Amino acid sequence: KVYVNGVKLSNSGFWTFRFVRCDGVDISKVYVEGHANWNNDGFDIESRNVTITDCVVDTDDDAICFKSEDPDYVVENVTVKNCDLSSNCNFIKFGTASAGGFRNIRVSDCTLHKCSRSLLRFWEKRVPGVSDPITGIAGMALEVVDGGFMEDVVISDLTMEDVQTPLFIRLGRRKTSE
């Protein structure tokens, strides 16, 4: 089992935490600040039996992103609870890497709001109707575009502020010649 507790990480070179094919991850009381580049995700999860609790994530990119790049592997049995998530992109994202699938995932009791600063995106210059340079794009982005599946995903008791799209759902077929 992997335990990450009580650490603070700032401005990683890429995704701050990336868990791939782990069975048993317990993340608690972690502080992530990431504004160094476009891909400063907080947590990227492609594992099973994961718990993320009482964390603070302030990133320019996705705060928490669930990825499923292997068609023979399912991201499952994950709980995210009581987290304070700040983003200038997606707060909680499933996909777009979605070749396998997502099953039995719970997200609850989290606060989502715009990040503390932005050095990169400046949405008000790029998106019509957006007047604030710092704003979250999607509170929850549920994207299955690589042939995978999503089942038994429960999202409850989220508080969102300064989010352009509270819920974004995309089902598609990318990377295909059909």
Predicted segments with their positions:
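Extracellular/periplasmic carbohydrate-active domains that bind, remodel
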Residues: K1-E178
